[in-house]
Amino acid sequence: MTLQPASGARDLNPQQVRKNHLIASKLSSLYQLWGYERISPPHIERLDTLTAAGGISNNEILKIVSDEPLGLRPEITASIVRAASTRFNEYERPLRFWSAGTSFKCNQSIDGGIDIEESFQSGVELIGTKAINAEIELLSLLIESLEVIEIDQKYKMTLLIGNTYLLELILSSFDSTKIDQIKKILSDLDYIALTTLDVKEEQRMFIKTIMNMRGKPEKVLTNLQNIYGSNSYIDKLEELFTIIEPLAKEKGIEVQLDPTLGTKYKLYSGLTFSLVSSSTSAPVTIAKGGRYDDLVKKFSSSAQNCYGIGFSISVDKVRELVSTSKEKLVNNVKVLIAYKQSANLYKALKQQKELHRKGIISVISHEPLKTIDETNQLLKTNRCNKIEWID
């Protein structure tokens, strides 16, 4: 019998579980203050639901053996959009939903096998409005989310913003047979692959210019306007940045416009964004989101209000960035209730109930304690930092 978890899966220890719960609890309280209501879609969905917008590859889905094609959700958005278009179809728009749960994704390992990527996510979806104010609302909520989960200040946070339609405009001058190849080069910032790309030299230099363009929104927008002139996508981004950039700056978050960002997330159509944190090794993407109007259209029976935008935060990744000094538990006292005679067990249970009523964690010794060594060992075993004796 194999005693290890499946490849890619992992066991979380009590401290990791506690921190996950604390982060998710803080986020859920914030979402509710913003008027979002909890929804809990199933972990198992039909494959046509999970692959509806083409944003998720069939190879990334962990399949379920059944009479119909089913799989574990690799992300939560598609399931919520399906629910919004069916069970909540008659509800007035916009719909504001939040969710928290586990998603599963398949990755191919080096040896050709399958690795299961299991992640705990928390996020929101705003469905049924196309206003730019909806995008501003979501980005503002994401910025405020960082404040409530209290990431260690030693980590630098960067909010990257892009637009898939802007990317399409940039790529429109290239041969359609080269588009996917160029997207991959842009996504990977692969300068080596760019040198071997079969395009004219001026086109190669243009791609390199776009790859190097990410930076301060005002500067990037000016560069784009010099190339394309007045454009609705550029104008909307300019309007968005006038509000979001000052809000982010107040929280110590750098905002950058990345024209290549749309290459990374196929689920989105329109605004895309990701929140990246510095770390001790490589940058870590802790949240991502964007517009997914095309996904809503796939599920909707009506052509009206087919709009959606949302984001998800990786609680597992955030957990590693939260300052341990700011991990605020309700009560960090843990009491061992001890007794020397079995006849005092009833009194010990009554004392435990009283401590629980006060919100104090307490455990009872299962045996009478006779010596100091026994007592100290039990304190250590139960990870208690205080003892109460029942005489």
From Swiss-Prot:
Tell me one GO biological process term: histidyl-tRNA aminoacylation
Q: What is its main location?
A: cytoplasm
- What pathway is it annotated to? Amino-acid biosynthesis; L-histidine biosynthesis; L-histidine from 5-phospho-alpha-D-ribose 1-diphosphate: step 1/9
Q: Which key words tag this protein in UniProt?
A: Amino-acid biosynthesis, Cytoplasm, Histidine biosynthesis
The yes or no answer to whether the keyword Transmembrane helix is present is no
The disulfide bridges present are: none
Q: Which GO molecular-function terms appear in the entry?
A: histidine-tRNA ligase activity
Record-linked Pfam families: tRNA-synt_His
Compartments in which it is found: Cytoplasm
Coiled-coil stretches noted in the UniProt entry, renumbered to this chain: none
Q: What GO terms fall under cellular component here?
A: cytoplasm
User: Could you confirm whether the keyword Metal-binding appears in this record?
Assistant: no
Known partners and oligomeric status: Heteromultimer composed of HisG and HisZ subunits.
Q: Which family does it belong to?
A: Belongs to the class-II aminoacyl-tRNA synthetase family. HisZ subfamily.
For this protein, the record's PANTHER family field holds: HISTIDINE--TRNA LIGASE, MITOCHONDRIAL-RELATED (PTHR43707:SF1), HISTIDYL-TRNA SYNTHETASE (PTHR43707)
Q: What else is known?
A: This function is generally fulfilled by the C-terminal part of HisG, which is missing in some bacteria such as this one.
The record's listing under HAMAP family reads:
HisZ
Q: What does this protein do?
A: Required for the first step of histidine biosynthesis. May allow the feedback regulation of ATP phosphoribosyltransferase activity by histidine.
Q: What is this protein called?
A: ATP phosphoribosyltransferase regulatory subunit
Source species, please?
Prochlorococcus marinus (strain NATL2A)
Q: What lineage is this protein's organism placed in?
A: Bacteria, Bacillati, Cyanobacteriota, Cyanophyceae, Synechococcales
